[in-house]
Amino acid sequence: MTILISGSGIAGLTLGLTCHQLGFPFKIFESVEKIKPMGVGINIQPNAVRELFDLGFEYDLENIGIKTKEFGTFTKKGLKIWTEPRGKLAGYNWPQYSVHRGQLQMMLYNRLVNLAGKSCVCTGWKVRDFKDINSGISVEVVSENKKEKKFETGSVLIGADGIHSRVRKIIYPKEGKPIWNGAVLWRGTSESKPFRTGASMVMIGHASQRVVAYPITQTNKVSGKAIINWITELKFDPSKGWRKEDWSRKVNSSEFLPKFKDWKFDWIDIPELINNSEDIFEYPMVDRDPVKKWKKGKSLLIGDAAHPTYPVGS
């Protein structure tokens, strides 16, 4: 019987590809009408790269990202504290990659629909409710655009629908909203000359004010520049709350840039990186308390729906 999946983010698409590889029938429901590349940079650690290689993405990852060579921490004056190698250079059997999240998502989506057909991802439909039945699970899905609803039957329902998971909310109806820890992150990408090894990830500053930066593309041989992903972080009083737990809220740099105006070093210029960005996204650093189980009956959770975190180094 069919495996039903809620959400076509990184977890949902990877799960769909795994189902196809193993010969299990599946169907993904995605609330948006059209899947578009969203987000900024992320790091894919060697244990995750191993799974993507197994799905046949070894050459694709090389085309959309860059192998991370080094991680380093630095003071707010730009002085080195610690550096260490990453990926194969650190002894792993697989590399670490830095990529644009949107490029990663579209890589997964395009491969999936090429292998299994476009009908395997039902866009414009989202899970509203579900219940276990003798033959598996019955899932109610709705289309707000079409003003329709229908029922799908499968062997299991897997919630891959993120930190605001509808599946998780039904399993744990009293859980409430995600918890904010007082940190706010601003993220963006800009074209700039890469620093240090040319494939280094750096963390600059301290716990209440810091910057993370790393390239997410190969260096252009003509311009000598790469796309650099950057993250700035400031701490606030968590008791006062924040506007919204939303990583895609566009903002102006004036909300945080003054705090980093002097962070100009001989190897990286943080204000320049920020000012050269076309779009800047703001989101609070939120997660949820652990739950005892990621499964109830024939429904279960994966990804941020199961264990949501927003690590500043991602």
Predicted regions and their residues:
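Conserved FAD/dinucleotide-binding core of flavoprotein oxidoreductases
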Residues: 82-105, 142-152, 191-279
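Conserved mid-domain beta->alpha element of the FAD-binding
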Residues: 5-32, 158-159, 186, 255-256, ...
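Catalytic P-loop NTPase motifs of RecA-like helicase/translocase cores
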Residues: 35-36, 166-167, 309-310
